Design a protein with these regions (language model features):
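Active-site-proximal, Lys/Arg-enriched surface segment
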Residues: 8-95
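Short, conserved catalytic/metal-binding motifs centered on acidic residues
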Residues: 1-3, 7, 44-55, 89, ...
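Short, structured patches in soluble enzyme cores that scaffold and shape functional sites
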Residues: 91-93, 105-107, 145, 165-169, ...
Length: 217
């Protein structure tokens, strides 16, 4: 193996699109090999996790693409933090192997934008690119309550994907009401001790179809 400085120098010469293309070839090779087919859930769907993470934080603006957060101190003065985030789509291959399927940076177009970029908008861009790169891949999107928005769920339905999303009682009142409605009718399902994992979970299906209400974000 070459020295890590040599590897870093080589990678710096490559465009992000080139690296993304290489990742795609590696993922398609893994899927074609059928080595990890047992990782698929019912119906042959591959689980893909959506999750955003922070990369860098600054006290001053780093570049025109910085996101910013305004904090109010105890003395009522304002403090502005600047930061960079990225959204990752991770493909689950088994209980111990998760690989990157796609990457989307969450960033402002310039410092004068009136509305900042966010994880949901980044998710829309990332999901569109995943569909283009893997048009026939059967996918089940996994995510926290942030992605349980009608716009994200509609993308999944249009792509004939499945999705498993958490709910948030505070911000998603309609979904929470539908969820409790199904539970009250005893149409809930339980999963106990899945493979090597020990525990118990409760879930219901088709929450968005029960009362006809939709969460709009």
């Amino acid at each position: 193996m070459p020295h890590y400085d040599t590897r870093n120098y080589y990678l710096e010469q490559l465009s992000p699109n080139c690296l993304d293309e290489l990742r795609g070839k590696m993922i398609r090779s893994l899927i074609r090999s059928k080595t990890f087919n047992e990782a698929r859930i019912a119906g042959g769907y591959w689980r893909i996790i959506l999750d955003g993470t922070g990369l860098f934080h600054f006290k001053e603006r780093h570049c025109e693409n910085c996101l910013k957060a305004v904090h109010i101190n105890e003395d009522k003065s304002k403090r502005i933090d600047y930061y960079h985030k990225v959204l990752e789509a991770k493909l689950i291959l088994n209980d111990k192997i998760i690989v990157s399927l796609g990457t989307e940076f969450i960033e402002n177009e310039n410092e004068d934008v009136t509305k900042q970029d966010c994880e949901q908008n980044a998710a829309k861009r990332l999901l569109a690119r995943i569909k283009k790169q893997y048009p026939r891949l059967k996918i089940c999107i996994l995510g926290d309550a942030l992605y349980a928005a009608e716009s994200i769920m509609q993308i999944c339905r249009n792509n004939e994907w499945k999705y498993i999303l958490n709910k948030n009682d505070g911000n998603q009142k309609n979904i929470s009401k539908d969820y409790e409605y199904i539970k009250a009718a005893e149409e809930k399902y339980y999963e106990v001790n899945y493979k090597l994992e020990k525990g118990k979970s409760c879930f219901v299906n088709h929450v968005e179809e029960v009362t006809g209400k939709k969460e709009i974000f």
